[in-house]
Amino acid sequence: KGEASYAPGAACHGADGNSGSPANPKLAGQHPEYLNKQLQEFKSGKRANAIMSGMVAALSPEDMKNISAWLGQQKAKPGFAKDKQTVALGERIYRGGIADRQIPACAGCHSPNGAGLPSQYPRLSGQHADYTTAQLSGFRDGVRQNNLTMTQVAAKLNDREIKAVSDYIAGLR
């Protein structure tokens, strides 16, 4: 059921949820609970995105659960860090945070390998760096407001740190 309902999403997110576009998230292998929450928030307007709001408008709660379950069963393709100059900084932030600025380690919630925790924290490993950068910047700048913790953490990061941690996340396995 989920695959058929997901079909319109393939244009942006890939036939199996592995988006080829760095601007669009990879959804394959993501926790179904997280995906379902995001779909509900696009539909309610709590998470603002004109394209996604239109895509989910006709979906029922059952459709959203089925899509989320199907995407969660797909195999995520690994990503790769691209900037060797910033990946070390990204690793330091991801694994240890920045204590003197009260920035917690990303790994504390999203796990050391980026697997996240079902129903609590999304899987990050292998996600496109461009997408992660856009989301962290959105949280920091108040554009994305559907997670208070992420808004508070991202508010303390500068552009260089966001880019570095995003690139590091892309290469996590």
Indicate where each model-derived feature is located:
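Extracellular/lumenal glycan-associated surfaces
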Residues: 29-33, 38, 122, 127-128, ...
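Predominantly soluble domains enriched in secretory-pathway, periplasmic, or organellar proteins
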Residues: 1-4, 23, 36, 73, ...
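Sequence/structural segment immediately N-terminal to covalent heme-attachment motifs in c-type
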Residues: 1-16, 83-115
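Conserved functional loop/turn residues at catalytic and ligand-binding sites
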Residues: 13-16, 31, 46, 63, ...
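The feature marks the first
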Residues: 1-44
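Short coil/turn motifs at helix boundaries and re-entrant loops, enriched in small/polar
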Residues: 29-31, 97-100, 128, 142, ...
